[in-house]
Amino acid sequence: MLILTKVNIYMLIIVLWLYGYNFIMSGSQCPMINDDSFTLKRKYQIDSAESTMKMDKKRTKFQNRAKMVKEINQTIRAAQTHYETLKLGYIKFKRMIRTTTLEDIAPSIPNNQKTYKLFSDISAIGKASQNPSKMVYALLLYMFPNLFGDDHRFIRYRMHPMSKIKHKIFSPFKLNLIRILVEERFYNNECRSNKWRIIGTQVDKMLIAESDKYTIDARYNLKPMYRIKGKSEEDTLFIKQMVEQCVTSQELVEKVLKILFRDLFKSGEYKAYRYDDDVENGFIGLDTLKLNIVHDIVEPCMPVRRPVAKILCKEMVNKYFENPLHIIGKNLQECIDFVSE
């Protein structure tokens, strides 16, 4: 009888424990928790529209950055193949001009006058160079003159950036030519990958030191991507794709002008043109329709009121037609003086 009683007691304890567990875990026994008036206060409302919008922005930002890094890595990989091909071609070209004159082979070279000037200029810089790092820096000045203009966009460029988001890289294909020239001048045409990496780091330090002297003026700033709005969704997407490749508003203006007025820059006729007609100074006004396109693309990207943006845009157009910095060769003497110091 005593044993049976103990068993019953144990069974009763188990039943009560299970009932209590179900009572605690069941919402039916605690109507206050299920009541709509009960709100669990949190710092972030997970299901709110505002939170969803923030998450969408973060996701888009991450996707854009991931896409950018992927494209950069693809370009770098393609540049390695380009380096090998370019070096073989450069060595053959050098051998060719030892046995013949440039005048003899000029007809077979596309844009032979520009090619001849480029070869002549970079040879002059190479001959004057006494230090590999200074030679690379001088050739960057020569081949990327538009980056070293008044907007100081070179601040955002590095040869081997620590962050591919914070800094852009110089064109790997132009860097290949610079590398070949340095290997010819200092390393007897031997491929020195490790040495090139060290030189790149030294040049980046020079760029950092020079960057500390300047800032990008506020008038050249661009809006954050999410704040850029065109006249339509299609326009907005197109403008954002243009802006992705730019550091400053001046660079964006230049990019659009080179597309719309390509023939003028290619022929050299750009020298006779300005934003408006200027009979007294002998300048021809640019096509109004094309200028409107420039304004439609550039103004939505500038962090100022539209009337101010229009004035600044006009100034940048005139400035670029006065001195289009994408045309290389104008600063040859500056580059030679730099490597000679």
From Swiss-Prot:
Domain of life: Viruses
The keyword rRNA processing is annotated on this UniProt entry: no
Induction description: Expressed in the early phase of the viral replicative cycle.
GO function term, MF aspect, one: DNA binding
TM region(s), chain numbering: 7-25
GO biological process: symbiont-mediated suppression of host innate immune response
InterPro entries registered for this protein in UniProt: BEN_domain, Poxvirus_E5R
Membrane topology: Single-pass membrane protein
CC per GO annotation: host cell cytoplasm; host cell nucleus; membrane
Sequence ranges assigned to domain BEN in this UniProt record: 112-222, 233-328
Keywords assigned: Early protein, Host cytoplasm, Host nucleus, Host-virus interaction, Inhibition of host innate immune response by virus, Inhibition of host RLR pathway by virus, Membrane, Repeat, Transmembrane, Transmembrane helix, Viral immunoevasion
Subcellular location: Host cytoplasm; Host nucleus; Membrane
Family: Belongs to the orthopoxvirus OPG067 family.
Subunit and partners: Interacts with host CGAS; this interaction inhibits CGAS-mediated type I interferon response.
Stated role: Major early protein present in virus factories. The presence of BEN domains suggests a possible role in organization of viral DNA during replication or transcription. Plays an essential role in the inhibition of the cGAS-dependent type I IFN induction in host dendritic cells. Mechanistically, abolishes cGAMP production by triggering host CGAS degradation via a proteasome-dependent mechanism.
Name used for this protein in its record: Protein OPG067
